Amino acid sequence: MRIGNLNVEIEFIADNIVRVLYYYGREAIVDNSLVVLPNLEKLSIKGESTGPSIISFSSESLSVDINTSNGELIMKDNKGGIVVKEKRRDLKFNEELSTYNVEQEFELSEGERVYGLGQHAGGNGLGQSSAYKLDYSGLSTTLSQRNTDIGIPFIVSSKGYGILWDNYSLGSISLRRNKLKVWFEAGKKIDYYVIYGDSIDDVIKGYRKLTGDAPLLPKWAYGYWQSKERYKSQDEITSVVKEFRERKIPLDVIVLDWRYWGKYGWNAFKFDETDFPRPKDMVEEIHKMGAKLAISIWPTFGKETEVFKDMESKGCIILGTTAFNPFKDECRELFWSYVKGFYDLGIDAYWLDASEPETGLGLVFFSPIHDVDLEIGKGYEYLNAYPLMETKAVYEGQRRISNKRVVILTRSAFAGQQRHSAISWSGDVLGDWATLRAQIPAGLNFSISGIPYWTTDTGGFFSGNPETKAYAEIFVRWFQWSTFCPILRVHGTIFPKEPWRFPREYQEVILKYIRLRYKLLPYIYSLAWMTYSIGYTIMRPLVMDFRDDQNVYDFDEQYMFGPYILISPVTLPSIIEKEVYLPSKEYWYDFWTGEKLEGGRMMDVKVTLDTIPLFVRSGAVLPLLGKNVNNAEEYWDVIDLRVYPGKNGYFELYDDDGITYEYEKGKYYIIPITWDEDKQELTIGKKRGELEMSKKIIKIIWVEKGKGIEHTKPDVEIEYNGKETITVKRG
């Protein structure tokens, strides 16, 4: 079938997922997608003539109508409502690059909002602007990989659909006057997928069906990460962990930043013995103290290093750079062979820094890779997919040899990267109030782009002196917010930012939130299971849960952490109250006081240095850790189960061994918990799953005014072994 000069093909991957493909010539160019999984099943749906110049394709959920006369493509839901309207498209030949530029235009509905596209906040002082907006109305956004800027060609609409473009080149998305204009620098075809759902969760689930699930990280990855640029010796880094333990501050991960290679040259995959004389002993000492070690690794190498010479001799260095080529199978395997040396030492996580890649050369958008022949194709065709392929090298490398879960921290990302156990962070941002505000919509857009694990340099990379109250306040507010991010991590340059570096009153607040993070771990880990098993999103723009309430569409500084907790971070200095919107058709509980409040309104919430506005949805059954721990791996044998009455509620408490991939084989357990509002009964069902479970003490608290989060005296205490159902009546 043709529209103008272009051939068009329509494929249904599922009832609610449609692929649209435009190309010149008789047959589509067949190549292996880097993003979309291979061998996806397709529905057998053929086009039918349904009117003059109209060809239609229909499933139970969607119909696609193509007007071969005027070129319009319209997708409708099963009630006839318009989902997507593509007005035009073009493949324009670019003589300079000898390829085609991709151009498209979509017509949006009045009031429709668009989210996603990765992370675009700036705030690093390198010329990028900080945008505080969550939706992209009135903006033009460049899709490229830069420090603090992550380009992902996936949008999500407030109407309940998403569009994923299978294109890896430099791109631009412009949204003005209800028109969405799309441009990519290079493409032999136009290739995109529309995903529709009853909810935005359905859209993200469809995105993961196309691009892969997000594996569970090990349990310790959801605890507290301490980092700085940099710990300069073996003695220094082990002494920091020791001090955490002596001060009884929970800690799971300590991070070793760059330059540990010393005399061996840039990123040599070796430790300089002057400062790191016994690296294996260092790792073992950290492990004995109940912590894990992450290490910085770069995609570039000093020309004097053995690894560079080896890579170059095997054709694995990209011409004109010192970066390895992750688009070649043998080069990914070679890169992993060097990373494996760290794995063999017992190192637990890999920090793949500057994975754009930052080469130290080139202009803002056009790195030296842009014009190079990568063998798979021209650099400009594959530019944005570099971090996807670098993380693939490490993830697949470790999975081939080990059942131990992979953990990758990386500065850049691309569509599909969630399948590589990759956590992204927002880059080298400034440590000021404006940048803090910008991080929130940046993280929300990244999360709704389908990649669930995200964090920041808490307090900013370029930060102030922790001994000053002005900076200490910024850090505390940032830390409070980071407690409710998928990953909690502190990092920065010049000044160390361990909790004890701050004035006493600020230090106490930091410790309060570290302990709160650990109380939340049973909830967070259960959300991680949902992320893997049903395509869930942990850090959630309000539009995901309250799409019927149009008031929430533009809230840049409020979001849901899982299904229950509403967060409104404090992002201005010295304030004593903050205006917060509680979504409609809900009752809410003040997290700190237990007071029940009606939704559908704005309200002024008082804040102190040690509190931010936090609210819990009625119907929540919130499982918290009921004891103090040093790290996330200690057994969760005491659970505080907080019940927030007001409507029916259900939650599944999940656990497994926390270390291996045995959960993929059913080695886990789930505890189903149900709150019946009419009967005022809590039912804890028999555990499901193949993993054996030791008994737990469950302390039940019926939340009401005066029973905020710091109220820990249970109303009912039960012993639970998972073998029988227990029902508890509220007294």
Curated annotation (Swiss-Prot):
It comes from the Archaea. It catalyses: Hydrolysis of terminal, non-reducing alpha-D-xylose residues with release of alpha-D-xylose. Its EC number is 3.2.1.177. CDD domains: GH31_N, GH31_xylosidase_XylS. Gene3D superfamilies: Glycosidases, glycosyl hydrolase (family 31), Golgi alpha-mannosidase II. GO terms for biological process: carbohydrate metabolic process. This is Alpha-xylosidase. Keywords: Glycosidase, Hydrolase. Optimum pH is 5.5. The keyword Zinc does not apply. Coiled coil: none annotated. Catalyzes the liberation of alpha-xylose from the non-reducing terminal glucose of xyloglucan oligosaccharides. Has high hydrolytic activity on the disaccharide isoprimeverose. Follows a retaining mechanism of substrate hydrolysis. The lineage of its organism: Archaea, Thermoproteota, Thermoprotei, Sulfolobales, Sulfolobaceae. It is an enzyme of class 3 (hydrolase). Optimum temperature is 90 degrees Celsius. The keyword Hydrolase applies. It comes from Saccharolobus solfataricus (strain ATCC 35092 / DSM 1617 / JCM 11322 / P2) (Sulfolobus solfataricus). Monomer.
